[in-house]
Curated annotation (Swiss-Prot):
Keywords: Disulfide bond, Iron, Iron-sulfur, Metal-binding. Gene3D superfamilies: Fe-S cluster assembly (FSCA). Belongs to the Fe-S cluster assembly domain superfamily. MIP18-like family. Iron binding protein that protects DNA from Fenton chemistry-mediated damage caused by hydrogen peroxide induced oxidative stress. May be involved in iron-sulfur cluster assembly. This is Fe-S protein maturation auxiliary factor PG_1777. It comes from the Bacteria. SUPFAM superfamilies: Fe-S cluster assembly (FSCA) domain-like (SSF117916). Induction: Induced by oxidative stress due to hydrogen peroxide. It comes from Porphyromonas gingivalis (strain ATCC BAA-308 / W83). The grpE-dnaJ-PG1777-PG1778-PG1779 genes are co-transcribed and may form an operon.
Length: 105
C-alpha cells in the first residue's frame, strides 16, 4: 500500500467521524456502525455499515450523510453503501470513547 492510499483511508475515517445519528450524540464510526471501508485502486469506495435498529427513523439521512462525506474525500471517485443487519449491532461494538460519552463506562 502506498502513502496516498493510506492517507485516503485515514481521511475517510476522519470524515466518518463527522457523521452523527441525530438521536445519539456519538459519531457513526465510534458507535460501531461502520463494519468495513474498502478503498479500491480505482478510487471507488464501498462502505459496509449498519444502523442501531432496522427501523431507524434517521436511516436515509445517515446513509446519505455517509455517502456525501466520503465522496468529499480527495481521491474518492465514487461511493457505494452496503447496508446490512448481519451481524446485528449491539453496544459492545462501540469504541471506548463512545461508551464513555453515553455513560456505559
Amino acid at each position: 500500500m502506498n502513502n496516498e492510499f493510506l492517507q485516503t483511508e485515514e481521511d475517510i475515517v476522519r470524515m466518518l467521524r463527522t457523521v452523527y445519528d441525530p438521536e445519539i450524540p456519538v459519531n457513526v464510526y465510534d458507535l460501531g456502525l461502520i463494519y468495513n471501508v474498502d478503498v479500491g485502486a480505482d478510487g471507488f469506495v464501498t462502505v459496509t455499515m449498519t444502523l442501531t435498529a432496522p427501523n431507524c427513523p434517521a436511516a436515509d439521512f445517515i446513509i446519505e450523510d455517509v455517502r456525501m462525506k466520503v465522496e468529499s474525500v480527495k481521491g474518492v471517485k465514487g461511493v457505494k453503501i452496503d447496508l446490512t443487519f448481519e451481524p446485528e449491532w449491539n453496544k459492545d461494538m462501540m469504541s471506548e470513547e463512545a461508551m464513555l460519552e453515553l455513560g456505559f463506562l
